[in-house]
């Protein structure tokens, strides 16, 4: 987002700080009149989901957002941002099989779904302060330098890629460039409020994702991760993050007039691989 706004010649204030307790907020924030606040902080979901890991995931999202909104409540009204854009996740929908999901679809079941529900509820409290609130229900972000793609590129590049379980589960994804542009659109377009799916319009299953990446890298993808092995090694994370199915439609984005730069998975891979 900072990159996108800087390209447009707009000033950006970056703040990296723990805001679970208001007293730890960067001192610049209360003194600065902000146009918008984009809140993307949170413990990584990667790793074994022990009880301690789940607690860190929850606190870094729900409790930190609660603390942030409380902190904004101490600001002078004229200094508060007019919009709070807060991260959420496509995990909001839970494991929904082949159901086609948009922003009006109800939440699902499971840890991630409950997390996203409470996370969004915490963000929406900022509406009481007169702020427009947007929640980003984000799929897997494909970018060259961060997230899952660099690891996937290495694994598939060695010819070790393969589908997860049956491969029939739907995988919401988005190119990092579209994610950044949609966040900027959420900041600047007043008609966007509430949840918005940050996912590409081309929904794909894990099997299709696997085949597409292998083809882009000119490598085979013969391997297959059995469900029982994934559950044994990763426990709850396997069912929710790797085997859960969300067939997500970015209805709010398309209804707002947004045109995706990378609407297809093959095109996204070509961009990331420099083809």
Where are these regions (language model features)?
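Conserved Rossmann-fold NAD(P)-dependent oxidoreductase catalytic core, especially the SDR/UDP-sugar
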Residues: 66-110
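Mid/C-terminal beta-alpha module of Rossmann-like enzyme folds, strongest
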Residues: 182, 189-236, 270-275
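Alpha-helical substrate-binding/gating segment
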Residues: 124, 153-161, 169-204
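Glycine-rich "substrate-gating" loop/helix at the edge of Rossmann-like oxidoreductase active sites
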Residues: 107-111, 139-146, 166-176
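Conserved beta-loop-beta element that borders a ligand/cofactor-binding pocket
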Residues: 88-89, 121-144
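C-terminal amphipathic/interface module of NAD(P)-dependent oxidoreductases
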Residues: 239-275
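Non-catalytic, hydrophobic alpha-helical segments
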Residues: 37, 176-183, 198, 209, ...
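NAD(P)H-binding glycine-rich loop region in Rossmannoid oxidoreductase-like domains
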Residues: 9, 15-67
């Amino acid at each position: 987002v900072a990159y996108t706004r800087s390209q447009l010649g707009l000033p950006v204030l970056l703040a990296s700080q723990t805001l679970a307790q208001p007293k730890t907020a960067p001192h610049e924030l209360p003194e600065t009149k902000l146009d918008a606040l984009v809140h993307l902080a949170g413990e990584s979901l990667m790793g074994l989901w022990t009880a301690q890991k789940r607690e860190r995931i929850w606190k870094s999202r729900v409790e930190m957002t609660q603390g942030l909104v409380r902190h904004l409540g101490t600001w002078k009204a004229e200094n508060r941002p007019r919009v709070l854009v807060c991260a959420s996740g496509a995990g909001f929908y839970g494991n929904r099989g082949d159901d086609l999901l948009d922003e009006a679809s109800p939440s699902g079941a499971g840890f991630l779904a409950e997390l996203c529900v409470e996370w969004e509820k915490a963000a929406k409290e900022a509406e009481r302060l007169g702020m427009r609130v947007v929640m980003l229900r984000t799929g897997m972000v494909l970018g060259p330098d961060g997230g899952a793609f660099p690891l996937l590129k290495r694994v598939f590049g060695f010819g070790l890629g393969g589908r997860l379980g049956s491969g029939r589960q739907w995988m919401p994804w988005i190119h990092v460039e579209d994610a950044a542009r949609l966040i900027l659109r959420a900041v600047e377009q007043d008609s966007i409020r509430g949840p918005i799916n940050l996912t590409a319009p081309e929904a794909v299953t894990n099997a299709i994702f696997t085949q597409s990446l292998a083809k882009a890298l000119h490598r085979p993808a013969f391997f297959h991760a059995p469900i029982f092995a994934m559950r044994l090694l990763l426990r709850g994370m396997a069912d929710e993050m790797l085997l859960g199915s969300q067939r997500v439609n970015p209805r709010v984005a398309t209804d707002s007039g947004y045109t995706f730069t990378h609407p297809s998975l093959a095109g996204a891979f070509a961009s990331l691989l420099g083809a």
